[in-house]
């Protein structure tokens, strides 16, 4: 015997009704089947609305008409599709039910209220009609059918609207019916009868509970819950799109997940099947070939110690505390007895080890009743100061991680808390059951979605996300986007979902949180209408709960650099080749580091010095290992490396400068390079990394051009005048050559002083052979002397700089992946 249950969406129309019948028929070929049906989708909601509107004296006609139309369409669709379907008889059954419903509602209107017994009789009519219609379908197919009347066969105790079935007595009643083995068995869900023979209903998710009870009474081989999803997922797929379908889970895991908010099954449904060790299979009516999720005594997913993450929103926390709590026997019992008498469900409890306080969560809607009840119960204690005034926190959510394997595997809690910390989510309270099967945290309501997503990513090792917003799409920015596009196959292989969610130039921006199509981004940006707005990017992160957003600033803008602290505080990592932020005031420099540390975000700028060379990272690694910078010398400008290299080869200063400009090494105005300020900025960054608290004005800069030279006018005028310096530079080059040296434009750090100047270096110096646009950096430290640590390579160019930015992007994942 198998018990099947189909929910409201599964019987919403004629097509789905017949699909359910086909599933039942297929199962019946393998053995006897008993089926529990819900009301067609929306019917119960209409019935509840009719009760509420009738009591309030409002018009119920729209709800009544919609409900009648749903059944009319259902019957006509079945009549057209199924030969032999008794349309006229069943239409009469439906019409009679609605006629009775109208009479009952008229009585409610006269009374001005709806007694619970009447309410129960009204809201279960949809299930009753579903069974009548399904019986008609199988009689048309030629099957013998037995309909179990749940009011007669299921004995329930409790309230009219929330009863619990006595399985032992109900088993005897159903057995007495002696159902033939070849019959299709049908029973309306949600409904039972009390010891007076009155109709009662089984509360929320009552049809699932009905199916579990029937399976227990029949000692079924399996209870199948057919719904509109493929099974139980590790998380709500609407919150986490890459949630994984579970093959199996234990009764205890299912109970914990459902208690803490999973929507597939209600905790009451699990109790009967767990008591009688009946496997429960969750299946999709629209996708019957999917394997579904099997709930049983043990889980077969041994490789998944955590089975799911859930959240309960709209909670409030009440803290009862005070000096009188410590050592006072029975205080906790009084607190929860008050909640019980008030009919308020306590969802989560924590108590301090000092016994000074006890905290618990209740639904937000129950908060005021809970507070009043506690204040009445503890009036004297509050008045005398034995208890402190009740402390209440509102708009909270509970995030729970559930899995049998948590008992034996170390580190689950650490990873859970680490994920929340990385997302800047503050934990209000923590609770763990003695079974170690679940751990729950209380957070703010606004943080719940982000908390669930980041926890799922950490615990289930799904694709790691980087959501990139590129500002500035000139040389480096454009090259970066092209590299990201080309590297997508490699990224997918590494399970990295790197999506470009925003592209902006100085005028407009293009955004798509699901990822911009990178094969046509230039055309899309050209047609973009949305003005560039940094505030809009911040709002996107909060609105869509992005997990790992990264601002990539590929501009040279001071205005954008001034926003980095705000970006970090709002949850972005910041990756940039823009040197403006790191060479602003020392105060802003320190604010950036504090903002990054305080928000658990990364500020990465390895391309500030040396473009794609790993300069900053290597220097930081040295210093973190306890090394100390003693001295530094380096060629930090690709353009000046090229120019001074050409001087060695006999070119004049003016010719070398023109050639460097033609090859794209210099800025459009070469005076920007020849001033030495770009080198000074890079040197300041290195000095600050080494721990020196310096400003840009502290750098001693000797420009390439002597002070006596008139460098005024436009670019063409300047370049026309530049040959005036050729003889002087040729003489300096010759003098250096006589000593076996060459001229290099060098940045120096020595004893806390920073200098930028032309230096003559000999063949033993690591800078001697550096030319053609290369950078070279020589770090003399306590560990590296007398021979320095030398980094050498091309330190300019869009592609190498973009590659360095790409590497920094991947470092935003370093807390989760070894990349």
From Swiss-Prot:
NADPH binds at residues 476, 555-556, 579, 797. Its cofactor is a metal cation. SUPFAM superfamilies: ACT-like, Carbamate kinase-like, Glyceraldehyde-3-phosphate dehydrogenase-like, C-terminal domain, NAD(P)-binding Rossmann-fold domains. Keywords: Allosteric enzyme, Amino-acid biosynthesis, ATP-binding, Kinase, Lysine biosynthesis, Metal-binding, Methionine biosynthesis, Multifunctional enzyme, NAD, NADP, Nucleotide-binding, Oxidoreductase, Repeat, Sodium, Threonine biosynthesis, Transferase. NADP(+) binds at residues 476, 507, 555, 579, 664, 667, 797. Transmembrane segments: none annotated. In the N-terminal section; belongs to the aspartokinase family. NCBIfam families: asp_kinases, PRK09436.1. This is Bifunctional aspartokinase/homoserine dehydrogenase 1. It comes from Serratia marcescens.
């Amino acid at each position: 015997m198998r018990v099947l249950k189909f929910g409201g969406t599964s019987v919403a129309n004629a097509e789905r009704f017949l699909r359910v019948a086909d599933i039942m028929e297929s199962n019946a070929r393998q053995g006897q089947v008993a089926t529990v049906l819900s009301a067609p989708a929306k019917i119960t909601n209409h019935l509840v609305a009719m009760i509420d509107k009738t009591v309030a004296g409002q018009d119920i006609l729209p709800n009544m008409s919609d409900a009648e139309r749903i059944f009319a369409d259902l019957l006509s669709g079945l009549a057209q599709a199924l030969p032999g379907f008794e349309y006229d008889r069943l239409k009469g059954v439906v019409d009679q039910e609605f006629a009775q419903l109208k009479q009952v509602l008229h009585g409610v209107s006269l009374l001005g209220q709806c007694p619970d017994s009447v309410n129960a009789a009204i809201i279960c009519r949809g299930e009753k009609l579903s069974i009548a219609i399904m019986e008609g379908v199988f009689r048309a197919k030629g099957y013998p059918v037995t309909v179990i009347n749940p009011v007669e066969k299921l004995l329930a105790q409790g309230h009219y609207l929330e009863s619990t079935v006595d399985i032992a007595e109900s088993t005897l009643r159903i057995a007495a019916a002696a159902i033939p083995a070849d019959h299709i068995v049908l029973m309306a869900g949600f409904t039972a009868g009390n010891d007076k023979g009155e109709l009662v209903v089984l509360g929320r998710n009552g049809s699932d509970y009905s199916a579990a009870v029937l399976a227990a009474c029949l000692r079924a081989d399996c209870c199948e819950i057919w719904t509109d999803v493929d099974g139980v997922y590790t998380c709500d797929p609407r919150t986490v799109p890459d949630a994984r379908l579970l093959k199996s889970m234990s009764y205890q895991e299912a109970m914990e997940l459902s208690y803490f908010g999973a929507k597939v099954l209600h905790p009451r449904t699990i109790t009967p099947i767990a008591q009688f060790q009946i496997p429960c299979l969750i299946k999709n009516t629209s996708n019957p070939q999917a394997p579904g999720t099997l709930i049983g005594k043990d889980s077969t997913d041994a490789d998944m110690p955590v089975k799911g993450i859930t959240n309960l929103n709209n909670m409030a926390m009440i803290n009862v505390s005070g000096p009188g709590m410590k050592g006072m026997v029975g205080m906790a019992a009084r607190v929860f007895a008050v909640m019980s008498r008030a009919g308020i469900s306590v969802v989560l409890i924590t108590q301090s080890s000092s016994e000074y306080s006890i905290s618990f969560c209740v639904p937000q809607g129950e908060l005021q009743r809970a507070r009043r009840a506690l204040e009445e119960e503890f009036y004297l204690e509050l008045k005398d100061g034995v208890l402190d005034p009740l402390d209440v926190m509102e708009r909270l959510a509970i995030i729970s991680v559930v899995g049998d394997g948590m008992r034996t595997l170390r580190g689950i809690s650490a990873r859970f808390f680490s994920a929340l910390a990385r997302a800047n989510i503050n934990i209000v309270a923590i609770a763990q059951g003695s079974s170690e099967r679940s751990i729950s945290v209380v957070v703010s309501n606004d943080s719940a979605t982000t908390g669930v997503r980041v926890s799922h990513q950490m615990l289930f090792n799904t694709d790691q996300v980087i959501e990139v917003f590129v500002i500035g799409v000139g040389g480096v920015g454009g090259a970066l986007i092209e590299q990201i596009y080309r590297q997508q196959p490699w990224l997918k292989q590494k399970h990295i979902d790197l999506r470009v969610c925003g592209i902006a130039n100085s005028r407009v921006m293009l955004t798509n949180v699901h990822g911009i199509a990178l094969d046509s981004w230039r055309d899309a940006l050209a047609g973009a209408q949305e003005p560039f707005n940094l505030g809009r990017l911040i709002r996107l992160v909060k609105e869509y709960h992005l997990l790992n957003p990264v601002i990539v600033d590929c501009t040279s803008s001071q205005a954008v650099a001034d926003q980095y602290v705000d970006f970090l505080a709002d949850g972005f990592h910041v990756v940039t080749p823009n040197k403006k932020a790191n060479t602003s005031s020392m105060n802003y420099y320190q604010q950036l580091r504090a903002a990054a540390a305080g928000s658990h975000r990364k500020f990465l700028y390895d391309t500030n010095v040396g473009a794609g060379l790993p300069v900053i990272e290597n220097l930081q690694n040295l210093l973190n290992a306890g090394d100390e910078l003693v001295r530094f010398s380096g060629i930090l400008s690709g353009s000046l490396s090229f120019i001074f290299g050409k001087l060695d080869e006999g070119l004049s200063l003016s010719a070398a400068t023109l050639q460097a400009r033609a090859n794209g090494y210099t800025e459009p105005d070469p005076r920007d390079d020849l001033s030495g300020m770009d080198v000074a900025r890079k040197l300041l960054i290195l000095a600050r990394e080494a721990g020196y608290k310096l400003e840009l004005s502290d750098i001693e800069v000797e420009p390439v051009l002597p002070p006596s030279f008139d460098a005024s006018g436009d670019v063409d005028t300047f370049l026309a005048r530049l040959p005036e310096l050729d003889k002087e530079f040729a003489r300096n080059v010759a003098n250096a050559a006589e000593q076996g040296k060459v001229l290099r434009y060098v940045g120096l750090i020595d004893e806390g002083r920073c200098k930028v100047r032309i230096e003559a270096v000999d063949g033993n110096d690591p800078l001697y052979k550096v030319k053609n646009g290369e950078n070279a950096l020589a770090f003399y430290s306590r560990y590296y002397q007398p021979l320095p640590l030398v980094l050498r390579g091309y330190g300019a160019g869009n592609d190498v700089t973009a590659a360095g930015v790409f590497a920094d992007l991947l470092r935003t994942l370093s807390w989760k992946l070894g990349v």
